[in-house]
């Protein structure tokens, strides 16, 4: 298994208290494939560098996880299908 860092920018209209439960729903993909969610860090609402879908702000979250590459592809697919997710970025961490 490899280590990955996932940054997610969520729709700012979503309440910050509901961010963690909605992230849990997405991260169930990782847990189902016997991966491990190491850390979830919700940064909160921040101003975007440039507008995304005519929105000036977004709710940032950073997730450290350990899983297989196929699991990351499936997680990215699930996140991109959701309308509440503005942007995602997955980075593979070096050992």
UniProtKB/Swiss-Prot annotation:
<dbReference type="InterPro" id="IPR035980">
    <property type="entry name" value="Ribosomal_bS6_sf"/>
</dbReference>
<comment type="function">
    <text>Binds together with bS18 to 16S ribosomal RNA.</text>
</comment>
<dbReference type="GO" id="GO:0003735">
    <property type="term" value="F:structural constituent of ribosome"/>
</dbReference>
<dbReference type="Pfam" id="PF01250">
    <property type="entry name" value="Ribosomal_S6"/>
</dbReference>
<keyword id="KW-0687">Ribonucleoprotein</keyword>
<dbReference type="GO" id="GO:0070181">
    <property type="term" value="F:small ribosomal subunit rRNA binding"/>
</dbReference>
<dbReference type="InterPro" id="IPR020814">
    <property type="entry name" value="Ribosomal_S6_plastid/chlpt"/>
</dbReference>
<keyword id="KW-0699">rRNA-binding</keyword>
<dbReference type="GO" id="GO:1990904">
    <property type="term" value="C:ribonucleoprotein complex"/>
</dbReference>
<dbReference type="GO" id="GO:0005737">
    <property type="term" value="C:cytoplasm"/>
</dbReference>
<dbReference type="GO" id="GO:0006412">
    <property type="term" value="P:translation"/>
</dbReference>
<dbReference type="InterPro" id="IPR014717">
    <property type="entry name" value="Transl_elong_EF1B/ribsomal_bS6"/>
</dbReference>
<keyword id="KW-0689">Ribosomal protein</keyword>
<comment type="similarity">
    <text>Belongs to the bacterial ribosomal protein bS6 family.</text>
</comment>
<dbReference type="InterPro" id="IPR000529">
    <property type="entry name" value="Ribosomal_bS6"/>
</dbReference>
<dbReference type="GO" id="GO:0005840">
    <property type="term" value="C:ribosome"/>
</dbReference>
<protein>
    <recommendedName>
        <fullName>Small ribosomal subunit protein bS6</fullName>
    </recommendedName>
</protein>
<keyword id="KW-0694">RNA-binding</keyword>
